[in-house]
Amino acid sequence: LEAAIMDVVTSASPPVGRTRAVEILRGGRSKVVAQYAYDALAGYGAFAHLRSADVLGRVDEMLAAGRLRSTGGRFPKLRAA
């Protein structure tokens, strides 16, 4: 899961925040996912079997451990640390 999170964070363009990364990993079908072709990313839908809260929890663990960082601001984006 951590490798997939890191892959989404580093390959998504434009960059994504916590909840969008979770949406991509769980295979969400929002307009934004289609608009920016996030559904073409390797990790798209790979963790559809997990609850959103579980995937988000892992993202938060990676932030706390310093493996990811947040840009901050009103719409924070994730970056590899």
Where are these regions (language model features)?
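Accessory DNA-binding and partner-docking regions appended to nucleic-acid-acting proteins
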Residues: L1-A81
